[in-house]
Amino acid sequence: MLGRFLEVSVHSADIPASLAFYESLGLVQAAVGDAWDYPYAVVTDGRLHLGLHARDLPSPSLTWVRPDLLEHAPRLQALGIEFDFELFGEDTLHRLGFTDPAGQAIALLEARTFSPPPLAANHPTLLGYFEEFGLPTADLERSSAFWDSLGLVAFEPERGPFTKVVASGRDLNVGLYDVDLRSPVLTFADPDMAQRIETLRERGHRFAERLPRGMSTRDNALLVAPEGTWLLLTTGSV
């Protein structure tokens, strides 16, 4: 229903600073096209593709590519989805946007805006394995049904430090978190995450002062990017 996942799109007022941050963690740049008339860059670890946009936009947004978008739009509306915007002019990249029940911004484009670099499946970074886009929600049942209707497979709730439902797609997992987070997170996991966190602290990276309720500060942390993106570092037990 959504197409192929393209990127997590975030607004960055200082793209060079954001690039330096992500490259210091081991992510690499992708070659971008000329779809946008403002500065734009993409970094990736091979699983996560993060689009850095100089233009102000709902941040973070989840962006998919769907060919023949104009013809596909009525199928989304048939699900009861109301578009926040839709642009289908002759001289513009066709795109539309809407939000999920938790307020998460979702965008669909008709074509790609970058070319992924060739990376090994196990490309190493300081962050560990990108597991999912973590989305806080006050209504797990409603959010699960919404993402399931879009073609992701919502599994049974998992218990841990907090309750979550994983809505799994072929190229992105959305973790629906019943937790006290003010913003979505990029969730990375590694059994030895405590050592990774210590290394990042030694290198001077900035962390949020408070973790979600129930999460141990020994094995988990919230890394803060220059543009404000939150990266949740865990042992894989969330």
Where do the language-model regions lie?
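Core segments of cupin and vicinal oxygen chelate
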Residues: M1-G3, S9-H49, G134-L172
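N-terminal beta-strand motif that seeds the catalytic metal site of vicinal oxygen chelate
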Residues: M1-P16, P60-L62, L109-S144, L150, ...
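A short beta-turn/loop motif at secondary-structure boundaries
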Residues: A35, D56, F88-D91, V179-D180, ...
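Extended, low-complexity, intrinsically disordered tandem-repeat tracts enriched
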Residues: L52, W64, L108, L152, ...
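Acidic (E/D-rich), amphipathic helical modules within compact regulatory domains
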Residues: F21, A30-V32, D37-V42, G46, ...
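Vicinal oxygen chelate
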Residues: R4-A13, A41-V42, A54-Y129, G134-L135, P157-D171, E198-V238, ...
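Short, flexible, solvent-exposed loop/turn segments with mixed acidic/basic and small polar residues
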Residues: G51-A54, A120-P124, V174-D178
